[in-house]
């Protein structure tokens, strides 16, 4: 199996990685600002608490803890996240591709799979956001919070695995 970005010429991989990495950091910083009004007693981790609510009652409690301004921040953040998804997926996938280098071992195979996995994470993120949008717009019924939590969990697992795999690349030789 080929890495999803293997078609990119070698001389462009690192520059593109740095561009998407910088964009990821910048957008992450914006999300940090957007998340401040979402941190309440019911949602100590802001939007992440909402993503992982899992139950209608928990999602309702979180949504009820947000005033109109916070709900606007949440709605904007859910929409803005659609810009973040391809950005973080490309940054991490390029990072994995660079970490693989010329390796032809089990690490390279797993890192190649994870190159696809981070794009799958972005798809789960998109589905999660749609479910959260349904909840945020007063449609707090099952199965929206449950599906959002499952998608968020899969997304976080794939992203953490991808990040650990990319960072551990230097410890694996051919």
Residue locations for each model-derived region?
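Interfacial loop at the N-terminal end of multi-pass membrane proteins
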Residues: 2-76
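Alpha-helical transmembrane segments of multi-pass integral membrane proteins
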Residues: 121-170
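Hydrophobic alpha-helical transmembrane segments of integral membrane proteins
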Residues: 97-137
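Juxtamembrane loop-transmembrane helix junctions in multi-pass integral membrane proteins
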Residues: 4-12, 65-68, 72-75, 102-112, ...
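Hydrophobic alpha-helical transmembrane segments
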Residues: 76-99
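Lipid-exposed faces of alpha-helical membrane segments in multi-pass integral membrane proteins
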Residues: 19-26, 83-90, 113, 117-127, ...
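Multi-pass alpha-helical transmembrane bundle typical of ion/small-solute transporters
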Residues: 27-28, 32, 63-66, 76, ...
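Short hydrophobic alpha-helical membrane-anchoring segments
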Residues: 32-36, 93-101, 126-129, 165-172
């Amino acid at each position: 199996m080929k890495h999803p970005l293997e078609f990119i010429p070698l001389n462009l991989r690192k520059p593109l990685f740095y561009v998407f990495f910088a964009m990821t950091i910048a957008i992450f910083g914006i999300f940090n600002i957007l998340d401040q009004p979402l941190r309440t007693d019911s949602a100590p981790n802001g939007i992440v608490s909402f993503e992982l609510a899992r139950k209608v009652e928990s999602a309702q409690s979180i949504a009820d803890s947000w005033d109109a301004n916070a709900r606007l921040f949440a709605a904007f953040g859910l929409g803005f996240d659609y810009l973040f998804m391809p950005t973080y997926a490309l940054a991490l996938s390029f990072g994995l591709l660079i970490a693989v280098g010329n390796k032809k071992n089990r690490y390279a195979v797993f890192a190649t799979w994870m190159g696809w996995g981070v794009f799958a994470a972005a798809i789960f993120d998109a589905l999660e956001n749609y479910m959260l949008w349904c909840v945020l717009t007063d449609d707090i019924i099952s199965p929206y919070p449950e599906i959002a939590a499952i998608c968020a969990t899969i997304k976080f697992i794939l992203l953490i695995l991808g990040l650990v795999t990319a960072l551990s690349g230097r410890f694996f030789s051919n």
